[in-house]
């Protein structure tokens, strides 16, 4: 078993963009290039993106609460401003929405529509 670091980095970059846009720290247009790329990757499963999203949300929570032990240390400088922008309630809502998406995976949902909806719902929930 091996880890394809290039694919992981690509997913992480996309999910970080999703979080930045969802937190209203970036315009929706920033997400569009990733959304289109995800749509083209028809064989790539949404679960792989959700795993990365959960790790990033964990890091945001740790940083927001003053902790130091994050998993994505190499992007700390990108995560810190975002962690300072969002509230605990926003992170909780983001986790709940990701959980809801995970539940829908069995229904063969459209990845990009689901992720776009996640962004819009979080943007509406306030940072």
Report the location of each language-model feature:
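Charged, glycine-rich active-site and insertion segments that engage polyanionic ligands
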Residues: 1-52, 56-57, 63-127
């Amino acid at each position: 078993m091996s880890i394809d670091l290039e694919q992981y980095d690509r997913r992480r970059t996309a999910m970080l963009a999703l979080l930045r846009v969802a937190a209203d720290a970036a315009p929706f247009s920033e997400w569009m290039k990733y959304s289109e790329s995800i749509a083209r990757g028809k064989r790539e499963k949404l679960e792989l993106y959700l795993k990365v999203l959960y790790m990033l949300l964990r890091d945001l929570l740790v940083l927001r609460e003053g902790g130091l032990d994050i998993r994505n240390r190499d992007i700390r400088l990108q995560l810190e401003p975002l962690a300072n922008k969002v509230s605990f309630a926003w992170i909780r809502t983001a986790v709940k929405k990701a959980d809801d998406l995970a539940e829908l995976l069995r229904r063969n949902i459209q990845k990009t529509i689901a992720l776009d909806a996640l962004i819009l719902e979080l943007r509406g929930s306030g940072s």
